[in-house]
Every structure is written in C-alpha cells, then in structure tokens.
Amino acid sequence: MSEILLAAQNVTKKFPGVLANDDVSIRLRPGRILALLGENGAGKSTLVNVLFGMYRPDSGQVVIKDETVDLHGPDDAISRGIGMVHQHFQLVPPMRVVENIVLGDEPTKRGLVDLDEARNRVVELSERYGLEIDPDALVEDLPVGMQQRVEILKALYRNADVLIMDEPTGVLTPQEADHLLGVLRELTETGLGIVFITHKLREVLAIADDIVVLRNGQVVGETTPSQTSEGGLAEMMVGRSVVLQVEKSAADPGDVVLKVSELEVNDDRGQVALDGLNFEVRAGEILGVAGVEGNGQRELVEAITGLRHPSVGVMEIDGEQLTSGSPRQITKKGVAHIPEDREKHGVVAVYSVAENSILNRYHRRPFSIRGILRRDVIRGHAQDVVDEFDVRTPNVLV
C-alpha cells in the first residue's frame, strides 16, 4: 500500500482580499486519522476543497498515492479514491437513500439502472460498518445524523481510500458523535485514511493519530494526542493562552421570559411530536433541552419561533400570549433563532453579508424609511457586526 495516501505540498490559495491557505503542507498515511484543527476562518475547509478538486491551488501541489496530480474537479479526486463528506450535505432530498448513494455511478442491467443490485450493495456496506439505514427511505424524511450516514456510504460505495470529513460532528448529538468516531476508527482498520476537520479539542484527542493546527491560513503546529493536551491545542489555535474551565457563579434568575403550557405540536406527517409540554425560562438562566434527534426538538424550536403553530397549548413571551404569533411578531419580542441548518434556514446565500445581517429587521428604522432601504446604514451596521464578532470576510458586500 502507498506510504502517502494524500498530501498537500506548499499549497497557497487566495480569494479577493483573503489569503485562505499560505504555503500549507500536510500528509495522510494509510490507516490513520489526521485531524485538521483550527478556528473558524483558519483555512481548513479551503484546504480540503483543494484536495478534493473543488478549488485549484494558486501554487503548490496535491499528491495522491505518491503521485503529483492536477485535479480539474471532484470527479478527478473521486476517480483516484478520494471521498468527502461536506459540512453542508450534497444530497437530493426528494430521492431515496439508495438513489442518492449510487447517483452518477449506477449499476446497470440490460441498459437499465439495476436498483436491486444497488440496494444489496448499500445494505452490505451499511451492515459492515455499522451504518444501518433504510435504503428506500426518502432523504428529506431523515434526521441530519442519518443524512450524514448517506454521505459516508456514498464515498464507501465508490471505493474511497481516503475519506475527508468537514466538521462531521457539528450536527450530531453526543451519542451520535460517539458512534461516528467508532465507525471512523473501524474504517481505518481496513487501511482507509481519514482527514477529520474540527475545532472540538476533546474529539481530536480521542480519535486522531496525527494533528495539524491551522491559524490564519498557515500551519502553526503538528503533533499527536500523546504529545499535547486540550490547553496546548487551544493555545496553538488562537496564539495565546486559553482558560478552558470557567468558574461560574450560581444563577440568579429573574422574571419569567418564556412560558410554555400544555403544548402539543405535530410534525410534518401530522403525528404528535410534542405532547403536553410545560416549562418556564427565566431571565439570566439557560435551559438545556436534551434528547436523541427526532424526538421533538425541531418542532419545539419552530413552535417557539413562530415557524410552526401548536395544535394545543399556550406560549407566553414576557407575559404576552403569542401561541400563534408570526415569526416577525416573535422576533420583535426579542426572540432570536439560530437554526440547525444555517445554510438552508439561516442565511440567503445569494445575498451579501450586509443584506443577511438585517434579514429580520430590514423593515424597521434605521434600515429603511417608508419602504426604502438605506444602504449606507445597512453597510455600517454589518461592519459593526464584523468588527465586534470577528466575522472572517473580505468585506460586507460579498
């Protein structure tokens, strides 16, 4: 087997106003997990998109199985045994699991797609690697964790020797994340190499064989779990000492700001997802909602934010009954929402940073007057957000 499965050699990649990768070199060996660690904006996703053929490097080389290659697109990478599970899944929601997995590489029989053969192969792969899934389920009906399994099976179906995973646990429950890490370790026992992109320190120390840390597009450290610690990794990521354990004083909650009484909410199929739910949230406290995905969490969030109306029950915000309130009414009361799928439900990708920054308030002063948007005010607001929260963008108009 090749000594180096995948490597970047002195890769540099620029975008307008941003040096995303600056002379970056990494190497992945067979049967090992290489963790690519860094803050948001460190250049991790750009680097793996170069390795997968989605971007062409401005300088430097990509090496696959000891051969320097010129990738013209993902097809080139896939044909050379590189698979990738993107942070935002590349699936066709109305199609079945098996159809998504074999799409573009369908088995045929007498000139027709042989779905029976495809289904058998998918079942065999899913059982072998502990990725059990219904091959005939519609992807749009699957929770996010199951959709990720579809993406992994897509790569395995194409006989990947390398699996690149971009922030794979960001959408998973802790139990699902633990299961995934076990699956990845099992995959490496077959000789497969894995590039694991994350900013979660505990996962890196638990699963990685080798660790590369990126900061501001540059490699600032290479190590192994036995040679470092959470504190050491955090310091490499941000360039300064980091306090990982914060002493918190006891909560001193104030008035009730959200009250839910006997709430009943149906899911997309009309089945009861929440049944007689009761709770209160007071000012100054954090309420955690735990549970395996698909047990009503999404329906609860959508009911609170006005995206889904309860069939029974009452919801009060600051003492005002808003059970059937619209998203605009609820937002006006000070309720903010960061959705599970930020790309699909949180932003408008074709809009600029400035335009996205006022999506839920464009109709209010000072951003508009008598229905006319005030572009200068919007840009100024967006720049304030970028400065305050360290948003990594060349400017607010992209």
What residues fall within each predicted segment?
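Glycine-rich phosphate-binding loops of nucleotide-dependent enzymes
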Residues: S2-V398
